[in-house]
Every structure is written in C-alpha cells, then in structure tokens.
Amino acid sequence: METSLVLPIIDISSPDKISSSTAKLIRKACLEHGFFYVKNHGISEELMEEVLRESKSFFNLPLDEKMSLLRRDLLGYTPLHAEKLDPSLTSSTGDSKESFYFGSLEGALAQRYPNQWPPEGEVISWDVETYGASAHSDYGMVTLLLTDGVPGLQVCRDKSRQPRVWEDVPGIRGAFIVNIGDMMERWTNGLFRSTLHRVMPVGKERYSVVFFLDPNPDCHVECLESCCSETSPPRFPPILAGDYIKERFRLTYES
C-alpha cells in the first residue's frame, strides 16, 4: 500500500538564532516521522545543481574507469547490484544502484580512510521487484539528502505493521531531506525514530547526493541517561561507533 506523505518543513534561515519553537519542530519531526525537510540552509541552489551535475558526470563514465576506483575500506565506487540494503530479500541480486562514497578531506579520519578520486578533469524498462535501494534504515546519526527531483523515495513509518504502508516523499527544490539514522535511535533509546525507507524505480535515472553524519570510530555509543527511566530502561548495549558501522556494511555487502 502506498500513499503520499506530507513531511514537516523546517526553516533555518538564521541558524545562529534557532528559536525554541524551531527546535521543538525538529524534535517533533524526529519523534513522529524520523524525516523532515530543511530549507533556507544557506547552500545556494546553483551549488546544489552543480554537485548533481558532477555526480551524473561521474556515473556516466565507462565502467572500467569507475572500477579503477573500486571501494577500499568502505570508500570508493560500488557497482550495480553490489549492495543489498535489505538482507531479508530472498533474491540473489543486489539493489539496482551505483554508489561512490568519500569521507573527510582532512584530519585523522582522512589519513585513516583515504579517499579515492578520478583523475582531475575526467569527470565530465524496470521489473516491479527491482529496487533502486531496498528497504532499509540508515546506519549513522543524521542523513542529509539532495535529489534531482526524480521521484521514487518512499518511507514506512511503522516497520512492524503488515502489510507495510509506503508513503511517497517528493523532493522540494532548494531543500534537503533530513532523516534520523540507527545510531541516533540507539543514543536516544528509541525516542528518535530511524525510519524504514526505500527507493523504487520510476522508469528513468535518478541521481542523489547524500551526506552521512557519523561519530568518530572510537566514539562510545550508549543510551543517553536523559532518554532512559525505570519504565524505559536502555534498549541497546554500548558499542563503538566504528564497530557498529563496519558490521552494518558487512551485512550489506555479504547478503
């Protein structure tokens, strides 16, 4: 079952002076949906469009050139069908998507996990059971999503309900789609929702650029005291952020 979902739109035109009412709107969105839009974030539409153009240029390169940047230590190119974000799917074929992951450009993380880049200047009909990205929740803390306007993103707000109810999330020009990840759900003891989502094919190519905000690998993640009580004890054991992310990636690529 699929319907359209109206998500909250959060205006952060004055990020240094975010009011208590804006903070309450963000909290409400994290509690109820795990998804919301952010507009007036200070990033120009021209830059957003340029990033999408560069993404398209890279993925239009010949396969052998992209394979020369094949993923190492989680960073680099991931070819078509290499990922299966929903390990429960019985099909042996992975998701119908390509990815290119890169991380920090400076500091200790950049030295520990070096990025892979193409040479400078080089980047210039669907089956009903094929997924652009199968049903999953994101691994980390917070995700910011920029899309090219092509539809396909759907969310399921109640993952325990059967049959699942999928709701379309359209893009809004100039806005980012923001969603909560599993690590934030762990930290808040399930208070903030890491919502199940997927991308369905619509008969045309779809490009998106995603920013994943994650803790440092040695960060100790455990349920916050303020999110626990006698009636709501910690639901998740403590874990290092790096160990958690690596295990989630292992399941994605080995399933």
What are these regions, as identified by a protein language model?
Residues 1-255:
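Peripheral, non-catalytic segments flanking oxidoreductase cores
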